[in-house]
Amino acid sequence: MNLSNFIKICHLLYDRKYVVGSGGNVSIKNKNLIYITPTGSILGFLNEEDICVADIEGNILKGKPTSELNMHLKIYQNKESINAIVHTHSMYCTAFSALDKKLELLTPEAEIFIKKIAYVDYFPCGSLELAENVSACVEDSIILKNHGIVTLGKDITEAYVKTEVLEEIAQLNYIMNNLGE
């Protein structure tokens, strides 16, 4: 399988500071296989050879996947139309989540790509509770309390664009909150 676009998206996430250090993780589904970033990896420096592979039941076929593997698996198992997941710790979305503030969809892009945001309470990273609560969301753009965001798509480009738009509206909400009355 050609993973060049997968790697390109990982690098974009890092270059645009939606992830820092070893934070965040990305996966794509191809039939019964999940291609996912490895644990402890820095997305900006990943190569195709680094990508881990698991089947839809969670059997690891290659590498040591991210600790959030269960979350990715549960989403794919519950949402057949989803083929890509992006999880970041983007700064503005995470700040709003820590303050329990909801975001307003302020732009046409947000109305088109995001439509509605789900909010999930805090659960420990990598926990089954986090996986179950995120996978139960109907929405494809999910803000995790004190933890970041998860965006879902039919492909990795769609999931990435949702990440980009969600972080932009968080920034706009911040600006408007500080310029407004």
From Swiss-Prot:
SMART domains: Aldolase_II. Zn(2+) binds at E68, H87, H89, H147. It comes from the Archaea. Pfam families: Aldolase_II. GO terms for molecular function: L-fuculose-phosphate aldolase activity; zinc ion binding. Gene3D superfamilies: Class II aldolase/adducin N-terminal domain (3.40.225.10). One of its GO terms (cellular component) is cytosol. Substrate binds at G24, N25, T39, G40, T66, S67. It catalyses: L-fuculose 1-phosphate = (S)-lactaldehyde + dihydroxyacetone phosphate. Keywords: Lyase, Metal-binding, Zinc. Involved in the biosynthesis of the coenzyme F420 which requires phospholactate produced via the aldol cleavage of L-fuculose 1-phosphate and the NAD(+)-dependent oxidation of (S)-lactaldehyde. Catalyzes the reversible cleavage of L-fuculose 1-phosphate (Fuc1P) to yield dihydroxyacetone phosphate (DHAP) and S-lactaldehyde. Belongs to the aldolase class II family. AraD/FucA subfamily. Homotetramer. This is L-fuculose phosphate aldolase.
